[in-house]
Regions:
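Short coil-to-helix segment of the ABC ATPase nucleotide-binding domain corresponding to the Q-loop/switch region
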Residues: 97-104
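Conserved signature/switch motifs of ABC ATPase nucleotide-binding domains
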Residues: 136-139, 157, 164
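Helix-to-loop junction immediately C-terminal to a conserved catalytic motif
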Residues: 52
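ABC ATPase NBD coupling module
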Residues: 13-18, 69-85, 109, 114, ...
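ABC ATPase "signature
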Residues: 222-223, 231
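Helix N-cap at the start of a conserved alpha-helix in ABC-type nucleotide-binding domains
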Residues: 173-175
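Conserved ABC ATPase "signature" region
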Residues: 67-68, 104, 108, 115-132
């Protein structure tokens, strides 16, 4: 559905050129909810704006639904953008228009008849759960309600792709959850491809099928959400998954070696592994960190253990006897 090939973007600044994107290549399949996550300044918003040519890349190719955007005429690009809509952090509603007129606006620009536009707008207000707000003004709505109106407006032209640039960053956690559930429901009902730009791991965990981690304008890691967040392989991924630094805690390498265990289903997360190591093998481990989380609607657990050097091989052999537990040795950080 969306294919980015070797995208680079350079901005001119007073001090010289700044590389915002460096050879980024991604493929997003039709109907996916795809997350792009990274710290501030990683290049996330620049990347999503390249997907509809709000930002033109310095080099590289952007393909959407089998068409290369940069080779389109101005008229063809306008038509293509009706199928690649976008919502933002700050809603961008027209404050002097009612909610109904806000949703009608893109249809008016497309030349749709007024009666047809209003009928479609009312259907969309129903779809996003606000049929009673047609005559209300944006200032009369909560932040979550304003974002629902923005989503309805984005769907007005029956797009194939919905780009969400930090769409929940200005919302409280409960409202964020509600908006994410709405986006997922629309994805399932309409088959629309969704790209989520965020710096919040919780957003990606809740809604996305796949994720790419951006770091310094480059793709540090990508794949299924469950695989990337259960066992991040890149330094950028580890910073996101272990924001408190649990992955970098120092233990004495002369005394113990560390392993990360990934429990890949709800049954294995319930195994009292450390207790069994102590009871059955007389091996006493240092639990550095442990967590259980839901990723892509499945339960995963992770544990970082310090195992005495003298018993390391025997402990790893014992753990590997359990199915669905992945064992990975972790280097010490100084």
């Amino acid at each position: 559905m969306i294919e980015l090939k070797h995208i680079c973007k350079t901005f001119d600044s007073g001090g010289g050129e700044v590389e915002a994107l460096k050879d980024v290549s991604l493929t997003i399949e039709k109907g996916e909810v795809y997350g792009i996550i990274g710290m501030s300044g990683a290049g996330k918003s620049t990347l999503v704006r390249c997907m509809n040519l709000l930002e033109r890349p310095t080099s590289g190719e952007i393909w959407v639904d089998g068409q290369e955007l940069e080779k389109m005429s101005a008229k063809e690009l306008r038509q293509a953008r009706r199928e690649i809509t976008m919502i933002f952090q700050h809603f961008n509603l027209l404050m002097q228009r009612t909610c109904l007129r806000n949703v009608c606006f893109p249809m008016e620009l497309a030349g749709m008849k007024k009666d047809d536009a209003e009928k479609r707008a009312r259907e969309l207000l129903e779809l996003v759960g606000l049929p009673d707000k047609a005559n209300a003004y944006p200032a009369q709505l909560s932040g979550g309600q304003q974002q629902r109106i923005a989503i309805a407006r984005a769907l007005a032209t029956q797009p194939k792709v919905l780009l969400c640039d930090e769409a929940t960053s200005a919302l409280d956690p409960n409202t964020t959850h509600q908006i994410l559930q709405l986006i997922r429901e629309l994805n399932r009902k309409l088959g629309i491809t969704v790209v989520i730009i965020t710096h919040q791991m919780s957003v990606v965990k809740e809604i996305c099928d796949k994720v790419a981690i951006l770091d310094g304008g480059e793709v540090a890691e990508e794949g299924l959400v469950s695989a990337v967040f259960a066992a991040p392989k890149s330094a950028a991924g580890r910073r996101l998954v272990f924001p408190g630094g649990a992955d970098a805690l120092v233990s004495d390498p002369a005394e113990e070696r560390r392993v990360r265990l990934i429990f890949r289903d709800s049954q294995t997360t319930g195994i009292p592994l450390v207790a069994r190591l102590a009871a059955e093998e007389s091996i006493y481990c240092n639990v550095i960190s442990a967590s259980t989380q839901q990723l892509s609607r499945e339960v995963y657990g992770s544990m970082l253990l310090g195992i005495p050097n003298a018993h390391f091989d025997r402990a790893v052999e014992f753990i590997k006897a359990y199915p669905n537990i992945q064992v990975e040795e972790v280097e010490h950080h100084v």
